[in-house]
């Protein structure tokens, strides 16, 4: 690992502490990992899954519960995939692991026309293999490396293209109904994961070896959110807070709230209607932040 100045080391320690806190909080908030769990960490070779594995192992050493970790990588036989990189890294850190070799690349190439995105079919094939592997390994949880930015991008994609108010759940039952899938990075910022991967010098494997065209809609959402973050600091955090602070009675989904039964004797619900009032909305985002000395305070972002 690179030689670091005292200031760099201080900043890196703060970064690691922040990621530990975010992952630990997500685990606690959604009861992601329990006593005796065997957590299968899906390792793609990208920055996010490397960071997830590293921090989970770090937390494992000090957690008040006992749980096991097994890292799993799916070698899909994509051209140029370096099969030696992940085993060498995983051997060096002493973690239990399994490399699953399945030629899904040939299947995808056969089914998808040249130039079209292969991600959807590839993901379905990959999920099935990972579910099977989890059963073979006796894993009780499957950990995926999606972070806060992925969740917000998915929220915007569903709003703009599918007409749904839907993002990525932090915890769910797998498609086959046999496993619990968790996303420990749900509270983590992508920019923190990028910095962490650079510091730790993870042996990153490119994600475009398959030659698939990038998902243009998701790329557009990412660029839009990044632009908002640059122009309006704090807005992205506020958006993320919003999906954790939902008032069904003030939306329009009658499956979530029984609007039909409301009558004059129902009383005021969730603050009533503010259509005729001045909106009680702050001019700038107000966020809870953790200062370096771990004191919590409200700050206003200009």
UniProtKB/Swiss-Prot annotation:
Record motif PP-loop motif, residues: 44-49
Note: The thiolation reaction likely consists of two steps: a first activation step by ATP to form an adenylated intermediate of the target base of tRNA, and a second nucleophilic substitution step of the sulfur (S) atom supplied by the hydrosulfide attached to the Fe-S cluster.
Entry GO MF terms: 4 iron, 4 sulfur cluster binding; ATP binding; magnesium ion binding; sulfurtransferase activity; tRNA binding
Protein name as it appears in the record: tRNA-cytidine(32) 2-sulfurtransferase
Residues in the signal sequence: none
Binding site for [4Fe-4S] cluster: 119, 122, 210
This protein's pathway: tRNA modification
Details of cofactor binding: Binds 1 [4Fe-4S] cluster per subunit. The cluster is chelated by three Cys residues, the fourth Fe has a free coordination site that may bind a sulfur atom transferred from the persulfide of IscS.
Cofactor requirements of the protein: Mg(2+); [4Fe-4S] cluster
EC number: 2.8.1.-
Predominant cellular place of this UniProt entry's protein: cytoplasm
PANTHER family: AMINOTRAN_5 DOMAIN-CONTAINING PROTEIN (PTHR43686:SF1), SULFURTRANSFERASE-RELATED (PTHR43686)
Catalytic activity: cytidine(32) in tRNA + S-sulfanyl-L-cysteinyl-[cysteine desulfurase] + AH2 + ATP = 2-thiocytidine(32) in tRNA + L-cysteinyl-[cysteine desulfurase] + A + AMP + diphosphate + H(+)
The entry's keywords: 4Fe-4S, ATP-binding, Cytoplasm, Iron, Iron-sulfur, Magnesium, Metal-binding, Nucleotide-binding, RNA-binding, Transferase, tRNA processing, tRNA-binding
Biological-process GO terms, alphabetical: tRNA thio-modification
HAMAP family: TtcA
GO cellular component terms attached to this protein's record: cytoplasm
Location(s), subcellular: Cytoplasm
């Amino acid at each position: 690992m690179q030689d670091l100045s005292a200031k760099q080391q201080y900043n890196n320690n703060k970064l690691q502490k922040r990621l530990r806190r975010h992952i630990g909080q997500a685990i606690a908030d959604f009861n992601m990992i329990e006593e005796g769990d065997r957590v299968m960490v899906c390792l793609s070779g990208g920055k996010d899954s490397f960071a997830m594995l590293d921090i989970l192992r770090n937390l494992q050493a000090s957690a008040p519960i006992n749980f096991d970790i097994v890292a799993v990588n799916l070698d899909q036989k994509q051209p140029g995939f370096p099969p030696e990189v992940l085993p060498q890294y995983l051997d060096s850190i002493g973690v239990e692991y399994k490399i699953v070799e399945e030629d899904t690349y040939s299947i995808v190439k056969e089914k998808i026309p040249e130039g079209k995105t292969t991600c959807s079919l590839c993901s379905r094939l990959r999920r099935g293999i990972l579910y099977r592997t989890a059963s073979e390994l006796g894993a009780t949880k499957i950990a995926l490396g999606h972070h806060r930015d992925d969740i917000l991008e998915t929220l915007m994609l569903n709003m703009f293209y599918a007409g749904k108010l839907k993002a990525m759940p932090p915890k769910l039952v797998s498609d086959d109904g046999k496993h619990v899938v968790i996303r420990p990075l749900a509270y983590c910022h992508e920019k923190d994961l990028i910095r962490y991967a650079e510091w730790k010098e993870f042996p990153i494997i490119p994600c475009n070896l398959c030659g698939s065209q990038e998902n243009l809609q998701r790329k557009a959402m990412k660029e839009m959110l990044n632009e908002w973050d640059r122009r309006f600091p704090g807005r992205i955090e506020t958006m993320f807070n919003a999906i954790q602070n939902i008032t069904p009675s003030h939306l329009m989904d009658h499956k979530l709230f029984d609007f039909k039964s409301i009558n004059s004797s129902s009383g005021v619900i969730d603050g009533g209607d503010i259509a005729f009032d001045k909106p009680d909305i702050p001019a700038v985002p107000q966020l809870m932040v953790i200062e370096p000395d771990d004191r919590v305070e409200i700050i206003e972002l200009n």
